[in-house]
């Protein structure tokens, strides 16, 4: 869980947001706007299925990916998802990918094949892919052609937009793809769930 002080601060920001107004252009307020929008959409879906929605994040690769996964987890918890230890039981599965080795890509494709079978039994399940593997154009093309059941694809440069991308997917019934080649934007001050209380990572580069 997020620290109480951080949770209280974020909650105050979210409850003050008026979704009847257009989304702000400035960050991080734009992402807080979409967090509140996603939170309401998740709540509605939870009420429909009669239980809290769950998520599972799998991290491949480096410490930077582990740090990014903490951010993804923090945002998911903030919008109403509950962490699930078993991947096949989760309503939202995210793979934070790495391309250090070629077999890393094949490992992700293998996992996706298994998830496709799970998703057929759980139609409202979402599958998201992010990380440096998604920065490869040929990978994205392969996913668009052969893995149409994937819901959300984004890269390393716009992970701060996660709440916005989730809200976009929850409002639609289509694959959402948002890949940036590079960026000069660094957006911090967003929810982050640290896996270990005694250590933390600091990004000194992105991408």
Task: List each model region and its residues.
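Proteins enriched for Cys/Gly/acidic motifs involved in redox and nucleic-acid/cofactor modification
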Residues: 2-207
């Amino acid at each position: 869980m997020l620290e109480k002080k951080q949770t209280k601060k974020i909650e105050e920001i979210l409850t003050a947001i008026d979704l009847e107004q257009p989304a702000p252009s400035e960050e991080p307020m734009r992402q807080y706007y979409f967090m509140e929008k996603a939170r309401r959409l998740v709540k509605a879906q939870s009420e429909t299925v009669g239980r809290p929605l769950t998520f599972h994040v799998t991290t491949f690769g480096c410490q930077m990916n582990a740090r990014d996964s903490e951010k993804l987890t923090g945002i998911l918890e903030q919008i109403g998802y509950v962490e699930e230890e078993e991947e096949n039981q989760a309503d939202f599965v995210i793979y934070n990918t790495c391309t250090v080795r070629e077999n890393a890509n094949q490992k992700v494709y293998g996992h996706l094949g298994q998830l496709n079978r799970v998703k057929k039994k759980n139609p409202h399940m979402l599958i998201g892919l992010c990380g440096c593997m998604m920065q490869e154009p040929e990978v994205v093309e392969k996913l668009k052609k052969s893995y149409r059941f994937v819901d959300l694809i984004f890269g390393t440069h716009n992970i701060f937009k996660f709440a916005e991308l989730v809200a976009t997917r929850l409002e639609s019934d289509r694959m959402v793809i948002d890949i940036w080649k590079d960026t000069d934007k660094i957006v911090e001050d967003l929810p982050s769930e640290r896996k270990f209380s005694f250590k933390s990572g600091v990004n000194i580069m992105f991408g």
